[in-house]
Design a protein with these regions (language model features):
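Inter-repeat boundary and helix-capping residues of tandem alpha-helical solenoids
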Residues: 1, 41, 45, 81-83, ...
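Helix-turn-helix repeat elements of alpha-solenoid scaffolds
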Residues: 19-34, 59-72, 99-110, 141-150, ...
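Amphipathic alpha-helical segments of tetratricopeptide repeats
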Residues: 29-40, 70-79, 109-120, 149-159, ...
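Helix-turn-helix DNA-binding segment
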Residues: 264-309, 313-318, 322-335
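Tandem amphipathic alpha-helical repeat scaffolds
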Residues: 5-21, 46-63, 82-100, 123-139, ...
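Conserved positions within tetratricopeptide repeat
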Residues: 5, 25, 67-68, 105, ...
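Linker/hinge segments immediately adjacent to helix-turn-helix/homeobox DNA-binding domains
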Residues: 188-192, 205, 212-276, 282, ...
């Protein structure tokens, strides 16, 4: 595969976007070792623009390096490359993390146009969502709603509903629904985000932290402190691996301070299920025993048993079958 670094880059990107960090790192290593001066499939003179874009996507060294990598990718890849829109999205996210909100917003706007032109619908959906979050930050709720309507339309058109990064769209939509007083829609958006959250990992760390920050904001507004605390713990775990994420680090700290001011009266429920527990939940509906599930997930029997009992407790049930039934009723599992 080192003889085909472009294929390795694509494999690394797919692994990252679907929440598989170890696989993404493995393919990235193969791509880097196989880097050649031969042209890339999009007509770029070498594979370096693709590698630069991959490094930007993974953001292993913070927003400054991400910005440099994204600029290199955008500057050196072939004109009209189908990856130009992806490079613009990475540029926008790097500027956002650096606190350059206005610049980021303009780049997100450019990305939507580029993404639609080349069929990069996931990028367009994410860019529209980021514009919605920036609008929320300005208090422009109606504008945020319009951006989210467009993002949802793109997601539905391209069948992206089950794609992990779309979790951030649901987190933003939950906030808009909460502002509008639509409790049923709030619950629906939070449930969708919860189903996708386990697969939004440190493979793409800025999205992983952002999803948890935006969900924590919503749960905190609902006074569900147990859920907010769970999300901030997960954000901390990601930041231990990728500590340099600009404004997202500050947002986690601000939310933690806000959470400390709230009297903790909420009892951990389904909303407080951890990402690990949400990953286990679908396997509880299979014929596999807990030890067999442990083998499937490369976890010890004790770890799986502990996670399963934690799920039962948070769902308020006493058995595996009851947990599966109740999770399906909540929308966390397919019926």
């Amino acid at each position: 595969m080192q003889a085909h670094p472009s294929v390795a880059v694509l494999a690394a990107m797919l692994a990252a976007m679907t929440g598989k960090p170890a696989e993404a790192e493995r393919w990235t290593g193969i791509a880097e070792r196989g880097a050649t001066s031969s042209s890339a499939p999009d007509g770029s003179p070498t594979t370096e623009p693709w590698l630069a874009l991959l490094r930007a996507l993974l953001c292993r060294d913070g927003p400054d390096q991400m910005l440099a990598d994204a600029e290199l990718a955008a500057r050196t890849m072939a004109a009209g490359s189908f990856f130009q829109a992806a490079a613009t999205l990475c540029l926008a996210m790097a500027h956002l993390m650096a606190g350059h909100r206005d610049r980021a917003d303009l780049l997100f706007e450019d990305q939507v146009a580029q993404g639609r032109m080349v069929g990069g619908m996931i990028g367009a959906c994410l860019a529209l969502t980021e514009r919605a979050l920036l609008a929320i930050g300005r208090g422009a709720w109606e504008q945020a709603g319009r951006y989210l309507d467009q993002a949802r339309s793109v997601a539905q058109e391209a069948h992206l509903e089950e794609y992990p990064p779309v979790a951030v769209m649901h987190a933003a939509a939950a906030q808009v629904a909460l502002h509008q007083g639509d409790q049923a829609q709030v619950r629906a958006e939070l449930t969708w985000a919860q189903r996708l959250r386990p697969h939004v990992t440190y493979a793409i760390p800025y999205f992983a932290v952002q999803v948890r920050v935006e969900l924590a904001r919503c749960y905190l507004a609902l006074l569900d402190t147990a859920a907010a605390r769970t999300l901030l713990r997960e954000a901390d775990e990601i930041l231990r691996r990728r500590p340099d994420l600009g404004i997202f680090v500050l947002q986690v700290e601000d939310l933690r301070a806000e959470l400390a001011q709230v009297k903790d009266k909420s009892i951990p429920g389904a909303s407080a299920l951890t990402a690990a527990e949400l990953r286990l939940l679908p396997l509880l509906s299979t014929h596999l025993s807990l030890p067999e599930i442990g083998q499937e997930m490369f976890l010890s029997r004790n770890t799986i048993k502990s996670q399963a009992y934690s799920i039962y407790r948070k769902l308020g049930v006493s058995s595996r079958s009851q947990a599966v039934t109740h999770a399906a009723q909540l929308g966390l599992l397919e019926r």
